[in-house]
Amino acid sequence: VVLNVGDTTLTPEELKLRLQPDLVFTHYRHDLHQDHRVISDFTWNTWRTHLILEYEIPKYDGDLGVPNAFVPLGEAIVKSKARILMESFKTQRTKQWFSEDTFLSLARIRGVECNSPQKYAEAFYCRKLVL
C-alpha cells in the first residue's frame, strides 16, 4: 500500500509520528544519482528501526549492484509493473534506458539469479533484517 501523506513539508519526526509502516521502500544507498542517495539517507534516518528494502533503478550510471532479497513475480505482474512505470514517470520517457524492455529484462535477470519458478523477480537490498 502506498500512502499519500498529503503535506510534503512535514519534518522527519512529524512524518514518523503520522506513519507506522511495516515495510519501507527507498532508493538503493549506492545509487549514483545524488537525489536518490539523499532520499535513501533520509529514509534510514527516519525509520531506522523498521524493515527497509532498497530498490534498484536501471539507468546510464551502471550502478546496479548485487541485491540480496528477491520476490518472485509472474509475467502478468511484471508486465503490469513495467506499464505502470511507463505511465507514472512520463518525464523519463525521453531517456534511452527508460523502456518496458529494460524493466522486463532486469526482472528476467533477477528471476534467473533467484531461480524464480515464475521466471521473473524483483530484487532489493536489505541492510538489516530482524527475525
What are the functions of these language-model segments?
Residues 1-51, 65, 87, 102, ...:
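Active-site beta-strand->loop->alpha-helix modules in alpha/beta enzyme cores, enriched
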Residues 62-69:
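Flexible "cap/lid" loop of the alpha/beta hydrolase fold
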Residues 18-19, 45-51, 55, 70-131:
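C-terminal accessory domains and tails appended to enzymatic cores
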Residues 28-29, 56-58:
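Histidine-centered beta-alpha loop that forms part of the nucleotide-sugar donor binding/catalytic region
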